[in-house]
Amino acid sequence: MTPELGYALTVGALVLALYGAGAAALGGLKGRPDLQASSERAAFGVWLLISACMLLLVYAFLSFDFSIRYVASNTNRGTPFYYRITALWGALEGSIILWAWMLSLYTLIMVGRYRRTQPQLYPWALAVMLGISAFFLLVMTIPAPPFERLSPIPADGRGLNPLLEDSGMITHPVALYLGFTGFTVPFAFAMAALIVGRTGDEWITITRRWTIVAWYFLSLGLLIGGWWSYHVLGWGGYWAWDPVENAAFMPWLTATAFLHSVMIQERRRMLKLWNLTLIILTFSLTLFGTFLTRSGIIGSVHAFTQGSIGIFFLVFLSLVMLGAFSLLAWRLERLRGQSELDSIFSRESAFLLNNLFLIAAAFTVFFGTVFPLLSEAVKGQKVSVGAPFFNLVNIPIFLALIFLMGVGPLIAWRRASAENLRRNFLMPVVIGVAGAALCRALGVGNLIVLCCMGLVAFVAATIALDFWRAARARRRTGDGWLDATWGLALRQNRRYGGFIVHLGILVVALGVAGSQAWSTQTEATINRGASVELAGYTIRFDDLQPVEESNHFKVVGTFTVSDRRGPYTVLTPAKKFYPQEQTPIAAVDYRLGFMEDLYLVLGDFARDGSHATIKVQINRMVSWLWIGGLILTLGAALAIVPEPRRTATRPRPEHAVVA
């Protein structure tokens, strides 16, 4: 009964989404408020029915309803309670439900926010949102039905992928999908602006905060994904340029470019065509990432199973891009800028260069990701493109972007004079050079690391200089330094939230540079009671013990770690053996530190526990990534908060940075 009810709810939601999209479009075309109201009720119905689907599937997981193929494939009677809930999005079909539900929720919020305030753009935006929802519901109905019946009904299920039994997988997909689906709102309003012909700043003003919200969640998803990779996969890294990692990173890059370039349109009425192109690319890349993840055409630790779903996504992506760029071509005459670039030494130029570098990074990531597929299609042989290619091409681009993070906020609009350049950048340049020189004096010989350290010092100095000047100006009104600084963050939160985001990126950059330059590792086979030494640590092998868990068996090693001062910690890495898996899963153990992490992986071992192979890593400055990511997300959250209404006439500094 449950499979049939779930399928009926899915079909009902699909019918409502199709009807709502048509009614909204017709209402916008004919100016019919009754059709618009009907489409709004349809949007609510879509959300209600998808919510019912989710609750029904959660109930099926909790009650071990193995008559549903998806439940039997992703849980068993030994799966812990909370992982039975998160198994909802642990594989292909459930992840599509989560996507569709989030999309319907965003649609509902959009209805409540704009149905009375945006009579021209809103109906068409609603039609686009419901049309996209209809596609995902179609996927749930035909190629990836979550309620497909399984017969005969097994006594127990296969179980969840062991790598997903982690707290990171509770939050990582949710944050990532909130980011992906969030970009649908600015895309929908951009399409509405093209359809109606209102190609000015209106759609950007409407969607600015929506874009920051989506960017915030996508950033959070990438951060949690890096943490999951670091502490679950057992290789000691946080970013492998895996195709699915790249698929989430590409829309982040184009969305970051969009968030910066819209400021030029707001300030100078330039880049209208460019901004529309960027939001189309960002939304299209979210679909492309979904296609990569779910089509099975690539090999990835994140990818789902193969099936006809890839064809559905590829066709839909093609239709979206064809329709969007056709609208763009139709309105081309209306998209000519009202201003021109006055000088290469200007804020507009800095932001434009920022955009070009971000798009160049997105293109290189895209090319490296799809090249194996192109090679296989043309030559019949798949060529592997790994981290060396991505690092070689992207490191210079990212260094240039760090430099522009320091230039953009302080250089003048239109044309910067020599005096403006001297006043704003002389001291930061001196600090940047001094920072690089200090690192060299401390023994840093890697040129890339030296450049990164110097650029980070330069950008940090520009941020501090801007804060100091603005706080000093506020002090003239009688505020203290603390009140002045706090007031800046609260009253101009979009600007200073962006600065905090930049500060977080600087800390992340330091973490990446430090971890790549100074980390070290060793691998050794040692007898019980023996030790291995690395970078001042002594790791002694004490014991191996078998442990029986509810859904797996594991062997836990005990290792006592000492440093130069004496006993430091005890680490207990393990090997997990799942009945449904061919190979064991490594469960790493680690001790996190501000400057370095001690990371231990248990390899092969003797059955009698007489000896074991271990990999020991000293990963330096990796914690800076998580600290920088936290700072970044806090800055983005600050930029999302609406600025308070001003009751005084105090001059407001111009916006320069956005998250």
Regions found by a protein language model. Give the residues of each.
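Solvent-exposed, non-transmembrane regions of integral membrane proteins
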Residues: M1-A659
